């Protein structure tokens, strides 16, 4: 028989959005966007950070009430907000996100998971906290929040509770971070790797119990039967699951730099954005998320 080669049927793409609002706040923006690509054949999960300052073209959109909205250019972080205000619903926020990711990068999102700050804190505490390796600069930054988070951290491995973990994944101004989002998103992937590594070591019954406690805290674009189906696919993989980080999307090709100054709306106001080579990024992401050809190694680069 022919050896099995991973095809699009083996891939599940889950978009995780950390939504920047607390209970009672009306504004909705995507503070964090991570694509989790599950390869059920190779038993891998690959994490890709979506850079929030990327300048994207979002499509004309029909919301869940049937009303039509015109597309345009905007930073990726604002796509969630633009979709949300159509009907004040997560469904339209994630719907516009999914359409934008497909039209700009060729990413086909299968499922969406949205979590806000308060739910993130609760979920991490339910998991019993996460152990994360901190640099001296990161520890110093977090210790500025000492009165708020009640305990100090140090350089090296530290246990983070939900509140401190939230400060860690949102950190942007630690010494050496610079102006870009690269180090911040790298921290978020490191945190997700540590979280998944902890879940890997849990018994199947404990994972199921954890899922039952966490799912009510988040918004998901799945029916109960789809959630059950996904768990049935994922649980047998856990013990041998390999967790990978692919870096960011977009990946910067030569000739593109961070912090391009662009008049997005033609109103004379200049905004710092991330520009990218669309064709090269689509080819890269299709290979990474759908198994279409070999993943290019020399075209997209991380500076």
Model-found features: residue ranges?
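Non-catalytic, solvent-exposed segments at the cell envelope interface
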Residues: 1-303
